Swiss-Prot record:
It catalyses: (2R,3S)-3-isopropylmalate = (2S)-2-isopropylmalate. Its EC number is 4.2.1.33. Belongs to the LeuD family. LeuD type 1 subfamily. InterPro entries: 3-IsopropMal_deHydase_ssu, Aconitase/3IPM_dehydase_swvl, AconitaseA/IPMdHydase_ssu_swvl, IPMI_Swivel, LeuD. GO terms for molecular function: 3-isopropylmalate dehydratase activity. Catalyzes the isomerization between 2-isopropylmalate and 3-isopropylmalate, via the formation of 2-isopropylmaleate. Pfam families: Aconitase_C. It comes from the Bacteria. This is 3-isopropylmalate dehydratase small subunit. It comes from Mycolicibacterium gilvum (strain PYR-GCK). Heterodimer of LeuC and LeuD.
């Protein structure tokens, strides 16, 4: 997983709340056996509407999604995070995330930055008044900057550390590879093995 320090990209105002994972990516798109190629399913029902924000330039090139509260509710779908990332998003900003979505996002490298609802409204105002406004999200100092507006965001320290280090679950495990190999070499030969003999 790529380490995350800062990201600058076009802000996209998604003026919707209670966006569940089935709205992010409908179940029909979950049949794939790969982890990529889900961008066509992102907000599929809404993208049929030509006036939907992601169908409008310059928002169709955005990489920082600013959305209403309760984003990512519903079932646990890693595919929802993958669809957002495959479309090009690196950051989602909201005043409240579903816990399971927040966890899946952090494990995949998507930053879920939590701000106050007043700050969401302020960011929406800036990017709607000036389409194409670039938003810079700095994980190290936990700030969001859009033009002259700067707001703080919150994220738990553990997830921030994983993102800063670029550590997914496999990366975390591989940090302990020496200890794993040492354990395996000292296991009695009659026990099952995970490493070749």
């Amino acid at each position: 997983m790529e380490a995350f320090r800062t990201h600058t990209g076009i802000g996209v105002p998604l003026r919707r709340s209670n966006v569940d994972t089935d709205q992010i990516i409908p179940a029909v798109y979950l049949k794939r056996v790969t982890r990529t190629g889900f961008e066509d399913g992102l907000f599929a029902a809404w993208r049929n509407d030509p006036s939907f924000v992601l169908n409008q330039p310059p928002f169709d090139q955005g990489s920082v999604l600013v959305t209403g509260p309760d984003f990512g509710t519903g079932s646990s779908r890693e595919h929802a995070v993958w669809a957002l990332m495959d479309f090009g998003f690196r950051v989602v900003i909201s005043s409240r995330f579903a816990d399971i979505f927040r966890g899946n996002a952090g494990k995949a490298g998507l930053l879920a930055a939590e701000v106050t609802q007043d700050d969401v409204e302020l960011l929406w105002k800036v990017i709607e008044q000036h389409p194409g406004t670039e938003i810079t999200v700095n994980l190290q100092d936990r700030s969001v900057t859009a033009g002259t507006v700067m707001v703080p965001f919150t994220i738990d320290d553990y997830t921030a550390w994983r993102l800063l280090e670029g550590l997914d679950d496999i990366g975390l495990t591989l940090r302990k590879l020496d200890e794993i190999e040492d354990f395996e070499t000292h296991r009695p030969s009659w026990k099952p093995r995970t490493l070749p003999a």
